[in-house]
Amino acid sequence: MSLDISKYPILALANTPDELRSLPKESLPALCDELRAYLLKSVSKSSGHLASGLGVVELTVALHYVYNTPFDQLIWDVGHQAYPHKILTGRREKLSTIRQKDGLHPFPWRDESEYDVLSVGHSSTSISAALGLAICAEKEQANRKVISVIGDGAITAGMAFEALNHAGDIHPDMLVVLNDNEMSISENVGALNNQLARVLSGSLYTSIREGGKKVLSGTPTIKELLKRTEEHIKGMVIPGTMFEELGFNYIGPVDGHDVNELVRTLKNMRNLKGPQFLHIMTKKGKGYEPAEKDPISYHGVPKFDPSNHSLPKSSGGKPTFSNIFGDFLCDMAKDDDKLMAITPAMREGSGMVRFSKEFPGQYFDTAIAEQHAVTLASGMAIAGYNPIVAIYSTFLQRGYDQLIHDVAIMNLPVMFAIDRAGLVGADGQTHQGAFDISFMRCIPNMVIMTPSDENECRQMLYTGHKHTGPSAVRYPRGSATGIEVNKEMQALEIGKGRLIRETKITEKGERVAILNFGTFLSNSVEAAEKLDATVADMRFAKPLDETLLCELVTSHDVLVTIEENAISGGAGSGVIEFLMKNRLIKPVLQLGLPDQFIAQGTQEEMHAELMLDATGIEKQIRDYLDL
């Protein structure tokens, strides 16, 4: 979206941080208003993450105004809130392409800009990376400042506290900014706290504090009394005792929407030594009333008209796989009071809103704590309950040791409902569910199910729920196929697939069998019709249907495996391992996700580019057969 200078006269003068820093401080509030208006207009036309960015406009302006970025290194945790940062770092004109194929990356991305220090997408990584940068900056005596911005949700993850604990121990010069937009830590925002922040971050207080420590170094009793008195006074008005105990100098809470106050506080803190912690209070969706009232709905938005003060309603078409899972939970919980549903902060995305309201005593949101979520489930399983962990494929990676150590080794009946398996689309490399079959297939005791449609998904969820060991059902983001769902549930036989189509080739030509794992079944059948190939819906990536495999390999000349998972180590690799072990030598073409991190784009665009749509599957098979 090109910039209308008449509507954004100050923003037009701040295309880069150098230009921003040349502006008079008095112009910053007006700049924030223009930046917020531009962000709203651009995202409403292109879709993307909105509410988080609206909430950090003043913080973004203040950080780039005070610090000499990119020499000073600024890291945004997760990255949903980084749209204002992209606008102010030379990418304003391209913002309308964000999350689109060949467009701006949805998150800060090192290959995209020198201002993006860390490529992000998952939460709670910023403090660890900032600490590493700060350590190296001190070793090089670079006088470089390192800043990490983390939200009140992301800071609850264990990794963030591990980094805080380490930083407090080794005492590097670094700043952690806590963007608190949920009132989860404190509500003490106002003039008193802003004044207190000025005093506590100011040079006079700092010099008195440090000087007093030196004078009293020889009198430990008085020194300890003074330290406790300081902590007691600060503890009465400041919710930062925990961070002080971790070794940080805590400042705040500060009004995160007062840009001049932020600039003053950051300038005071810029030259302080040791680990610093600035706590700011913001409102997610700030400046656009519907987003302020409903920040969850406006977190990620489709294209919409801001003047309508509402988002477009869904067409009410095909249900999503997440909906299928949510309905399954509710149906099962009616008759199973030992069903326990666990999610690491993905209630809405995993389709669990209805369940959380109808069965609150059986619903557990662990916040951003995937490791804890998995081991929590193991404890419930040991107690004789039936836990189900609803988790995105990309986030299950974060609980891998717990999956092995706390579930699989004990062969506990924990089911993993793995959403966003395969290509997720606009969120790009960090969110593609490309590896779960590969990293689960090597774990003993695991059962891995790959439904081809929503009805099969429902039956597999039931199968996993009734299974006496660990199991996983993986399904993609987005709409299902639209077939009628059988409300009656019946457990499938573990490790058994089914034939969908049989070739009619008898004498001429090579007989091809397509072994489908997952929701590419319709694409496989369409390609098979053109090739007159056999199609098997394998259903289970582990254990494989060895009987069906033996039948197919003896009656066909070529096998083709297809899955929406990395080819390396995936279901196709399992097929080859079985054939080699049993000396069944036949050529096997493996189709799936290549050995690369796959960028953003729609699911349809990426399937076509990777030749995993029906046309691409047919072409890859023809090329392999040299037809």
UniProtKB/Swiss-Prot annotation:
Entry GO MF terms: 1-deoxy-D-xylulose-5-phosphate synthase activity; magnesium ion binding; thiamine pyrophosphate binding
Pathway(s): Metabolic intermediate biosynthesis; 1-deoxy-D-xylulose 5-phosphate biosynthesis; 1-deoxy-D-xylulose 5-phosphate from D-glyceraldehyde 3-phosphate and pyruvate: step 1/1
Cofactor(s) the protein needs: Mg(2+); thiamine diphosphate
Listed CDD domains: TPP_DXS, TPP_PYR_DXS_TK_like
Function: Catalyzes the acyloin condensation reaction between C atoms 2 and 3 of pyruvate and glyceraldehyde 3-phosphate to yield 1-deoxy-D-xylulose-5-phosphate (DXP).
Catalytic activity as recorded in UniProt: D-glyceraldehyde 3-phosphate + pyruvate + H(+) = 1-deoxy-D-xylulose 5-phosphate + CO2
List of residues binding Mg(2+): D152, N181
Organism encoding this protein: Aliivibrio salmonicida (strain LFI1238)
Cross-referenced PROSITE patterns: TRANSKETOLASE_1, TRANSKETOLASE_2
Residues bound to thiamine diphosphate: H80, G121, H122, S123, G153, A154, N181, Y288, E370
InterPro entries associated with the record: Dxylulose-5-P_synthase, THDP-binding, Transketo_C/PFOR_II, Transketolase-like_Pyr-bd, Transketolase_BS, Transketolase_C, Transketolase_CS
Cofactor note: Binds 1 Mg(2+) ion per subunit. Binds 1 thiamine pyrophosphate per subunit.
Protein name in the entry: 1-deoxy-D-xylulose-5-phosphate synthase
Family: Belongs to the transketolase family. DXPS subfamily.
A cellular-component GO term for this protein: cytosol
Gene: dxs
HAMAP family in the record: DXP_synth
Subunit description: Homodimer.
Any one GO BP annotation for this protein: 1-deoxy-D-xylulose 5-phosphate biosynthetic process
Keywords associated with the record: Isoprene biosynthesis, Magnesium, Metal-binding, Thiamine biosynthesis, Thiamine pyrophosphate, Transferase
E.C. number(s) listed in UniProt: 2.2.1.7
